[in-house]
Amino acid sequence: MRDAPAKGRRDAEKGGGGLSIFQKRDPPPSGPGVKRLTPKAAVCFTTPAMTRRAADWLGRLGGCRPLAILSDDCDDVVWQCTAEKADLLLMKADFTDSAEEPRDISACCDVAIEIKRRRPECRVYLICEDGYPKKQAALEKAVELKLIDGYCIGDLDPQQMRTWLDEATESMRAAESRDTEFRREEKQA
């Protein structure tokens, strides 16, 4: 037979209120009437470990719901961004000779084009390592042609990422207001 719990102890509470390493979070509200203010940020780096670290960093940074895309195959990335309804994709370009399949700017732009074709509201940003000054002109041209929405050479600092998240949030709001206006016009017609 079990003794009665001591008064004042945390584990004496009904419902198991004892100390837990894992905090229970309520799932975010969802459904047709709920507005989603935080963008889903998909991350796709050159290795699964780097992708996980980047997604964890985004989670700690806050202001988004991070999503790690562990495959770097173009079709997989496009499919997952589309299926998960990503609002932002952060990709790492890799120009090194040590990479099995170097992911150059052209390959990243191919992914970006397909994503924007299927999810026009998704913003795509590239991160590139320092030491490749010849690549900057190609990056600027990709932004000018609106193949990508921006890039960062070197380490991505939190302020730059917050700026990109803010841009994605604004894009979400603009798309939502267009949808609302369209629905209003349909009702009037």
What are these regions (language model features)?
Residues 1-60, 67, 75, 158-189:
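Non-catalytic signal-transmission and effector/linker regions of two-component phosphorelay proteins
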Residues 45-46, 91, 126-128:
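Short beta-strand/turn micro-motifs composed of small residues
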Residues 50, 85-88, 134-150, 163, ...:
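Conserved N-terminal glycine/acidic-rich loop preference
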Residues 56, 113, 140:
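Active-site phosphate/pyrophosphate- and oxyanion-stabilizing loops and adjacent acidic/basic residues
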Residues 70-88, 95:
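Acidic, metal-coordinating helix/loop segments flanking the phosphotransfer/catalytic sites
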Residues 82-84, 114-121:
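Conserved phosphotransfer cores of two-component systems
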Residues 91-101:
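Active-site residues of response regulator receiver
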Residues 102-106, 110, 123-151, 156:
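Alpha4 helix (beta4-alpha4-beta5 surface) of REC/receiver domains from two-component response regulators
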